[in-house]
């Protein structure tokens, strides 16, 4: 049966992703809804709630907010030692947050919008100037603070397909991490997977390929992505759907480029014309702020396996008050003050650091900014479950809608079969044809020894069947009236179906 792949817990501090995956499991196992029952019968859900479980355990049970990494020991600073300089809880509040310290040569100044924040220093800023660090000490006495955390290889930069050794966190080679390799082997062994969602946080953004400037999407696939993205925005109520490469984070932009979908202030969704003069491939404009992500899941699943791959950045903390397409940290602070009772940002407090002297410790806590607090968890999960179910409904699904018989005399019949794809997604994405990896829809007849198939081509092939589309195939057979013939149709991503008929005049 056609399948969708769901994974969470790829980034260890994004624990809402695991909860959302489990929310889907719960819905599928407990719902009596007729639509859910139909999905259980006609589709397959492969759900991996937590790709890096030891990372999320670190998040839940220690003071650390782990980075996007496996916990395989890694020498970040190339000093021959592994994971020797992590952040620490210095002030005993059971959190490892941030530190800021006055420094005449510092690169930061207090933000005039809100002095709890720092911004980059400009040439004419009068000071005082600051440096900022994660909370902790210089454990290895190399002059750097907390530069060698646990682990260091990012599984979402370790995928084959657009992998680069220069990408931070890429690892020694594509698929080097055991957790990711196990997932890749499973996906490779299950060619019925035609769609995926990789669950992440935060930002309230629906992401799609490409993640790098070298990759171009065929227009047919881009149109499909845009249509499903718009539906996803309506379901999740998020503000932006974009390619990873165009998502101008962290510096931000209005996110109003070609192929992006953005929710306007009045709630309507505006789509930017993605097509470049009717070309066969979508061409985006390179930009110095673009967020290239080599070795990411979306490009790997899409290009290597022909999977319509989305990543959902679950949860957005704060409101876009100036309608510039992003939620700034000053807007988040205002939201925390007015809506969250200041539960998410810890005020800066003085501390005597054993190496830096007088510092301030404070900043964003683990929960609230990147993951919703408990009162907001259920609503966030349910909206994302609906998005995943919507994508599952869109999977290609083959059926035999009609069989016509034409008697030609002398016990010869022409059988004409209409094959329907009732899913929104085609049986093959356009990228599969570009890469010469496409698999046709195959149909053939099963007959008894009393029936003979007269066609030279016993198996009929159709390159692809578009979403909500249909195609016809026909055979000539010889057999007596009442003989049974079974028509079989198969595509790895569209499923298998058959229909038995009796020859009749």
Where are these regions (language model features)?
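Surface-exposed loop and adjacent secondary-structure segments within mature catalytic domains
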Residues: 42-167, 215, 302, 324, ...
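Metallocarboxypeptidase
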Residues: 44-54, 60, 66-67, 148-408, ...
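Short proline/glycine- and polar residue-rich coil/turn motifs
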Residues: 460-469
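Short, hydrophobic beta-strand segments
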Residues: 473-481
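Short, aromatic- and glycine-rich surface loops/edge beta-strands on solvent-exposed regions
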Residues: 483-492
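Edge beta-strands of extracellular beta-sandwich domains
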Residues: 495-505
């Amino acid at each position: 049966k056609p399948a969708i792949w769901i994974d969470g817990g790829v980034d260890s501090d994004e624990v809402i992703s695991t909860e959302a995956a489990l929310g889907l499991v719960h819905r599928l196992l407990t719902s009596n809804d007729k639509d859910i029952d139909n999905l259980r019968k006609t589709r397959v859900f492969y759900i991996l709630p937590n790709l890096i479980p030891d990372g999320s355990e670190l998040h839940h049970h220690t003071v650390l907010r782990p980075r996007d990494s496996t916990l395989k020991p890694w020498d970040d600073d190339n000093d021959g030692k592994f994971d020797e300089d992590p952040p620490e809880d210095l002030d005993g509040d059971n959190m490892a947050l941030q530190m800021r310290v006055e420094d005449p040569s510092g690169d930061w100044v207090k933000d005039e919008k809100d002095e709890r924040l720092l911004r980059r220093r400009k040439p004419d800023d009068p000071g005082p100037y600051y440096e900022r660090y994660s909370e902790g000490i210089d454990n290895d006495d190399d002059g750097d603070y907390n530069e060698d955390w646990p682990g260091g290889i990012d599984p979402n930069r370790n995928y084959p397909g657009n992998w680069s050794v220069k990408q931070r966190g890429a690892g020694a080679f594509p698929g080097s991490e055991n957790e990711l390799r196990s997932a890749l082997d499973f996906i490779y062994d299950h060619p019925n997977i035609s769609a995926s969602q990789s669950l992440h946080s935060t930002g309230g953004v629906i992401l799609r390929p490409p993640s790098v400037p070298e990759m171009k999407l065929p227009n047919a696939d881009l149109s499909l992505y845009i249509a499903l993205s718009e539906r996803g925005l309506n379901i999740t109520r998020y503000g932006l759907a974009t390619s990873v490469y165009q998502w101008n984070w962290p510096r931000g932009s209005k996110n109003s480029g070609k192929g992006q979908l953005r929710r306007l202030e009045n709630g309507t969704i505006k789509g930017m014309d993605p097509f470049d003069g009717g070309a066969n491939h979508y061409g985006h404009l390179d930009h110095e702020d673009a967020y290239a992500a080599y070795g990411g899941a979306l490009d790997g699943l899409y290009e290597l396996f022909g999977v319509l791959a989305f990543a959902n950045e679950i949860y957005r903390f704060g409101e876009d008050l100036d309608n510039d397409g992003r939620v700034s940290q000053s807007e988040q602070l205002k939201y925390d003050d007015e809506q969250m009772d200041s539960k998410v940002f810890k005020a800066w407090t003085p501390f005597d650091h054993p190496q830096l002297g007088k510092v301030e410790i404070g900043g964003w806590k683990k929960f609230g900014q990147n993951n919703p607090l408990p009162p907001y968890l259920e609503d966030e999960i349910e909206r994302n479950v609906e998005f995943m179910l919507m994508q599952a409904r869109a999977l290609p699904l083959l059926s035999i809608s009609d069989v016509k018989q034409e008697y030609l005399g002398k016990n010869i019949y022409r059988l004409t079969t209409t094959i329907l794809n009732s899913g929104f997604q085609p049986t093959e994405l356009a990228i599969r044809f570009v890469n010469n990896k496409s698999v046709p829809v195959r149909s053939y007849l099963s007959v008894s020894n009393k029936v003979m198939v007269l066609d030279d081509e016993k198996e009929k092939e159709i390159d692809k069947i578009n979403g909500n589309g249909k195609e016809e195939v026909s055979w000539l057979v010889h057999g007596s009236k009442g003989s049974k013939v079974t028509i079989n149709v198969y595509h790895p991503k569209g499923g298998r179906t058959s229909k038995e008929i009796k020859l009749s005049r």
